[in-house]
Amino acid sequence: MDMTGTISAPLYLLRGLQLIGWRDMPHALDYLFADGALREGTLVAINAEKMLAVEDNPEVRALIEAAEFKYADGISVVRSLRKKYPQAQVSRVAGADLWEALMQRAGAEGTPVFLVGGKPEVLAQTESRLRQRWQVNIVGSQDGYFTPEQRQALFERIRDSGAKIVTVAMGSPRQEIFMRDCRRLYPHALYMGVGGTYDVFTGHVHRAPKFWQDLGLEWFYRLLLQPSRIKRQFRLLRYLRWHYSGKL
């Protein structure tokens, strides 16, 4: 807590990228709902794969650096932070879990929410489940199947809805581009890129069991289910080299 009484969180540098350090999920929620007022800005989950994308693509780096709240979603990133900053009290906050926690808090407080992305049927199921489970005040939605020409009208819909949380499930970097552009018209909300979270929430895609997650082996579980991911996993060897050579 800072001198004003607002919940604070330390910042850490990893390969030049500034990450926010949350101790756990309650800390993350209290930080985002500071003094009962939701912070404005963009939430971006950082894992090893995204760290590589930041290194290799200047446009992605600019997008990610511009986001106000970059947090450690991947266990590899958490371990790197703890190695570089031995006193850091930082834990993994999985993006899918943070989204659910935000939705639950939004339902309890009546915070207006706008959902973007996903297949039409998945989005409809997501809305229905959010309303049934937590009475979330969903003030608008749009599936991921819209044309570039429809973007501006969608930005205006989001602004006119008065949403205070906007979650975007379009995959990276498309969702980061969308959030950046929408915020230029309507900055008065918390934006969150959520990738495939709607699919997980509705049961169309299954996450690794908690046992695998706790061991930091969620990536291996996904590899067993999808052997075609092997090329993506080989790319992550470069991140391991940074970690073990101290080039963080």
From Swiss-Prot:
Documented EC number(s): 2.4.1.180
GO terms, molecular function: lipopolysaccharide N-acetylmannosaminouronosyltransferase activity
Organism: Klebsiella pneumoniae subsp. pneumoniae (strain ATCC 700721 / MGH 78578)
Gene designation per UniProt: wecG
Signal sequence interval, chain numbering: none
The keyword Protein biosynthesis is assigned to this record: no
Pathway(s) the chain acts in: Bacterial outer membrane biogenesis; enterobacterial common antigen biosynthesis
Protein name: UDP-N-acetyl-D-mannosaminuronic acid transferase
GO biological process, one term: enterobacterial common antigen biosynthetic process
Assigned keywords, A-Z: Glycosyltransferase, Transferase
One Pfam family cited in the UniProt record for this chain: Glyco_tran_WecG
Recorded family membership: Belongs to the glycosyltransferase 26 family.
Catalytic activity: UDP-N-acetyl-alpha-D-mannosaminouronate + N-acetyl-alpha-D-glucosaminyl-di-trans,octa-cis-undecaprenyl diphosphate = beta-D-ManNAcA-(1->4)-alpha-D-GlcNAc-di-trans,octa-cis-undecaprenyl diphosphate + UDP + H(+)
Record InterPro entries: UDP-ManNAcA_Trfase_WecG, WecG_TagA_CpsF
Job description of the protein: Catalyzes the synthesis of Und-PP-GlcNAc-ManNAcA (Lipid II), the second lipid-linked intermediate involved in enterobacterial common antigen (ECA) synthesis.
HAMAP family according to UniProt: WecG_RffM (MF_01001)
